[in-house]
Regions:
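Long, compositionally biased charged/polar accessory segments in the mid-to-C-terminal portions
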Residues: 214, 230-242, 258-268
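Selective detector of the "anchor" transmembrane alpha-helix that sits immediately C-terminal
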Residues: 283-306
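Inter-heme linker and motif-flanking segments adjacent to c-type heme-binding CXXCH motifs
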Residues: 1-206, 210, 217-226, 241-252, ...
């Protein structure tokens, strides 16, 4: 291949032989995917071509031809709902609706030629290629060992694998959507910590929304609050940081980000209230000025009438 493209990789076959597909083919299984199943036969196009069967937008559809076929996959005794789950995931939506071709698809996590199912010990390493800070915090957290001892995967325990939904604050705490209650029950320390963190997320989120509404009212009234609006962005950033810090499973670390955000939100709230108070003061001043002007005009009119008489 060097004469056609010196930089082109030529290890695809070697990788394929290490994959689940390759090993089963070597064992005599003729149903597994081979080169032409993914790349087609005559209509082979580079992966960068949107018409290619291995273009990022089309990879999941290529894999589903086998993996979403219940009858075809019956003998392998593995799930066949991966495509349905992935189609509803935040990753698929980011790719299809958001046009983000760097969003994960099947081969991002499983590999392509060397395709293999990621084990519990390796799945978080796959996720960490994008979610770096979350992975670093989790690696130092007490849940790292607890999950490993229980045979639970790091990321997928809370976020699932194929059907990954957009994370929300409702996932923390003791509500119906909480993932904490899958392991923690009322009365234990973890349950209480989860409730406390959920409450603080809620408090900061409400504080940010309250300040935002005040500043918007002030701005619509013509008051200058652009500096406060910029400061409020810092409070929003603190909320985002707190959500990332949650992966340390350290209430103290989360509190640091929440407390910083609350201080900023309170400061911007006070700026909004001050702006609205100044608006009312200006309105009152305008009313007094108008009243004075009207009184003066009335007095002048009366004086002129008297002069004419």
């Amino acid at each position: 291949m060097r004469q056609y493209n010196p930089s082109l990789r030529t290890d695809q076959l070697a990788q394929y032989k290490t994959s689940v597909h390759g090993k089963k083919l070597a064992g005599g299984d003729q149903k597994v995917a081979i080169c032409t199943d993914c790349h087609t036969v005559h209509d082979i196009r580079p992966a960068s071509d949107p018409r290619s069967s291995v273009h990022p937008l089309n990879v999941a559809d290529t894999c589903k031809r086998c993996h979403a076929d219940a009858a075809y996959m019956k003998d392998y005794k593995i799930p066949h709902d991966q495509y349905a789950g992935y189609s509803a995931s935040v990753h698929r939506k980011a790719m299809v609706e958001g046009g983000d071709l760097s969003a994960p698809t099947c081969t991002t996590c499983h590999g392509n030629h060397g395709a293999a199912p990621p084990g519990l010990a390796t799945v978080e390493n796959v996720c960490s290629t994008c979610h770096v800070f979350q992975a670093q915090l989790f690696d130092k957290s007490p849940h790292k060992k607890a999950f490993a001892d229980a045979g639970m995967g790091g990321c997928i325990t809370c976020h699932s694998n194929h059907r990954i939904s957009h994370p929300t604050d409702a996932m923390v705490g003791s509500g119906a959507a909480s993932v904490c209650t899958n392991c923690h029950s009322k009365g234990d320390a973890g349950f209480q910590t989860a409730e406390n963190i959920a409450g603080k997320f809620r408090d900061l989120s409400e504080a940010v929304d309250s300040s935002k509404n005040l500043l918007e009212r002030a701005a619509h009234s013509g008051m200058e609050v652009s500096d406060a609006e910029l400061e409020l962005d810092a409070a929003k950033d603190n909320l985002t940081k707190a959500r990332v810090s949650l992966h340390s499973f350290s209430a103290k670390r989360v509190d640091e980000d929440i407390d910083a955000g609350m201080k900023t939100a309170q400061k911007t709230r006070e700026a909004g209230l001050a702006a609205l108070k100044q608006r009312e003061y200006r309105r009152m001043g305008l009313l007094v000025s108008l009243a004075t002007i009207l009184a003066t005009v009335g007095a002048l009119a009366f004086y002129i009438r008297q002069m004419e008489n």
